[in-house]
Structures are given as structure tokens and as C-alpha cells.
């Protein structure tokens, strides 16, 4: 099942016009349609390939699937029938390396040629000083947030969520967990987007205000909650820093370090958590706040109505105004603790050309990648 099938629910018909053109009909105007069609979830697949697509995907891209060793690697080879420009690479292997120490060792030994989203930012200066490597620093679409269960007492009280927001020192988290890599955010929107509103002052670091808000909420003695952390270093390192900052205003957190499967089961699907830290890397995903059954369980009819109106609006100026209003609503409701936009750091062999500096979508595009002569 396509995880983003709701994005395409408005399609009523797809008609073949000629060998290279199709006509897509919608049940109503959709201002996000073209953007949605650029998602990886909108790729074309042959119906007869569906049964085995989980283990042997078939597509129309520049490379074809060759082999998958679960937990270790995926092997691709150049597609001789690719419709676009012929890629320079004949083959490519994607390795799975999640541990920061192992990542550093693999790159330093040149066992891998490119490591996108490098998980150990503290090692980047060492690579920058080594002529064998190049370091690219860009941006992702990843809003890194202190996700909050809006239905769990006392987190269902906006004063408590506001107290948490003012107890957090974003820059200390960026410096301590990400070694300075990351851009502070005050809402769920990418700072490089033209429609971004800087709302960081709405939740500035103010522990005394945090204590005052807790007292107003009847929690002058503080309270305890859970902080369940997925594997990425931004979460594990950031979690320790945030726990210390919350403790300073009287909020105690019980930290649990989870593997991704556990996090998906307990937090994302089970909603059995108080706080968690995660980067939402899907582009332009502020619409998730209009889904009351989403894992942070935010239910605001005004916001839901705004998103419905946005989806049916195609005028760019009107859409911009709506997106800015949406950012302000969730910032003022302190739905989550908005931390930073995740940086996109890549370490690569100095001879590799054509790599993406930024990560505008969840893809690693190899069509333009080549080796220098």
C-alpha cells in the first residue's frame, strides 16, 4: 500500500493521449497536485510488478534493481532502456551504515565513495582537512521537532506545551547535538522556503517564563513524562540535552532509546509516548497537522479548514498567505517543540562530481553523478 495514497485520492481518471503523454483528471481543483506528483510516491510502476515490488522493484529510472542483501546493501546497474540522458555510472551500491563510528571508519578507509546525510558532524572538520575528500553542506526538508502527544495529560494543556517550548535552548541543542550544523526554526516549515515565517521568538529560551507557565497550569512542582528516542544521533544526543533543560524547570523525563521498529510501533502507530524527537523530512508536510489521528494527535478545526481551503487554491499569492497563517497557528498552539532544520552534510571522494548539495526530496539522484578524469 502506498503510504501517501491520500495525496492522489482526487484523481478520477488517467487517459493516454499518446506514447509520451497522459491526461490526469481531478474531482476538484488541487493547488498541491503538481507538487505531489514530484514525490517519490508518485513513481510509475507496472501493475503486473506489484506482487513482487517489495523485494524486486521495477521502475522507469536511470538504474535498474539488481540485488538486495537485507540490512547490508542494495545493488543497481545502469538502465540501457532509460528514456533520459544516459547516466555516466555503470553501477552503484548502496550500503546501510547507521552507526556514526562505523560511518566514519568506512569513509576514512574509502570503503564507500559517498556518504550522504553523514551522521557524525563532529568528524566533518577532519574530512575537510583531508585532500582525499570533499564535504558538502546543504539543507534538507527535515524539520527536527520535539514531538508532543497533545492528548496525553498534562501535555494536552497548551500552557504546559508553551512551558516546554520556553524551557528549550535551541542553539545549545544545535551546538551540542549537531556541532553547529542546523538552522533554528519556530514552526513546522523549512527556512529556505519563500513562504517561511520566522517565529523563533514565539518560543525563545526563557526558563523563568517556563516555570511561571507551569505554576499557572497547576504544576508548580513539575511533572514526569516519557521521552522516547529513535536511533539518529540528533535524537539521542539532543534527547540528553533537552532532558537536562526540562529538568531545570521541574520536568522530569524517562528516556527510552528505541530502534526504528520499536519507535514506529510504540510512538508513531501506538501513540504511547509523551515526548519524542524526530526529523520530519517529507517536503511541504505542514498538512499533517490537519490529521487529528496523526501521532501527535493535534485536533484544531480552524487549521483543518485552512488546509482544506489551501488544497483547493491554485493562486500563488493566496496560497502564500494561507501557508503563513498555518505556520502561525501551530506556533501559537505550541503543538510541538520546534528545534531546527536538519542540515544535509555529505562526505565524498574528492573525484566524485554531480552530487546534490541539498536534499529537496527523499531521494539520492545518481543520474548526473560521475567520476572526474
Regions found by a protein language model. Name each.
Residues 3-45:
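Surface-exposed binding/hinge segments that line
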Residues 22-24, 61-64, 74-75, 90-95, ...:
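Short, well-ordered beta-strand elements
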Amino acid at each position: 500500500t502506498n503510504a501517501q495514497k491520500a495525496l492522489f485520492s482526487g484523481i478520477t481518471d488517467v487517459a493516454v493521449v499518446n506514447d509520451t503523454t497522459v491526461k490526469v483528471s481531478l474531482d476538484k481543483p488541487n493547488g498541491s497536485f503538481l507538487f505531489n506528483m514530484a514525490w517519490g510516491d508518485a513513481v510509475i510502476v507496472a501493475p503486473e510488478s506489484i506482487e513482487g515490488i517489495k523485494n524486486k522493484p521495477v521502475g522507469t529510472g536511470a538504474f535498474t534493481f539488481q540485488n538486495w542483501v537485507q540490512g547490508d546493501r542494495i545493488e543497481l546497474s545502469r538502465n540501457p532502456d532509460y528514456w533520459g540522458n544516459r547516466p555516466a555510472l555503470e553501477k552503484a551500491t548502496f550500503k546501510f551504515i547507521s552507526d556514526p563510528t562505523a560511518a566514519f571508519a568506512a569513509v576514512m578507509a574509502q570503503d564507500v565513495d559517498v556518504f550522504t546525510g553523514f551522521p557524525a558532524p563532529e568528524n566533518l572538520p577532519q574530512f575537510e582537512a583531508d585532500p582525499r575528500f570533499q564535504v558538502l553542506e546543504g539543507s534538507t526538508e527535515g524539520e527536527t521537532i520535539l514531538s508532543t502527544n497533545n492528548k496525553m495529560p498534562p501535555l494536552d494543556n497548551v500552557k504546559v506545551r508553551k512551558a516546554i517550548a520556553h524551557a528549550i535552548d535551541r542553539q545549545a541543542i544545535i551546538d551540542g547535538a549537531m556541532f553547529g550544523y542546523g538552522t533554528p526554526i519556530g514552526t513546522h516549515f523549512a527556512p529556505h522556503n519563500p513562504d517561511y515565517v520566522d517565529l523563533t521568538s514565539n518560543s525563545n529560551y526563557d526558563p523563568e517564563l517556563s516555570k511561571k507557565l507551569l505554576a499557572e497550569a497547576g504544576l508548580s512542582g513539575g511533572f514526569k513524562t516519557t521521552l522516547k528516542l529513535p536511533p539518529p544521533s540528533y535524537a539521542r544526543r539532543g534527547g540528553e540535552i533537552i532532558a537536562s533543560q526540562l529538568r531545570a524547570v521541574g520536568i522530569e523525563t524517562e528516556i527510552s532509546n528505541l530502534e526504528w521498529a520499536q519507535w514506529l510501533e510504540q510512538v508513531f502507530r501506538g501513540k504511547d509516548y509523551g515526548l519524542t524527537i524526530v526529523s520530519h523530512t517529507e517536503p511541504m508536510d505542514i498538512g499533517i497537522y490537519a490529521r487529528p489521528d496523526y501521532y501527535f494527535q493535534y485536533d484544531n478545526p480552524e487549521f483543518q479548514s485552512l488546509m482544506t481551503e489551501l488544497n483547493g487554491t491554485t493562486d500563488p499569492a493566496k496560497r502564500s498567505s494561507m501557508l503563513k497563517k498555518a505556520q502561525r497557528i501551530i506556533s501559537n498552539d505550541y503543538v510541538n517543540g520546534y528545534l531546527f532544520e536538519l542540515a544535509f552534510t555529505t562526505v565524498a571522494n574528492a573525484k566524485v562530481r554531480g552530487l546534490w548539495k541539498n536534499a529537496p526530496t527523499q531521494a539520492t539522484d545518481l543520474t548526473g553523478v560521475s567520476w572526474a578524469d
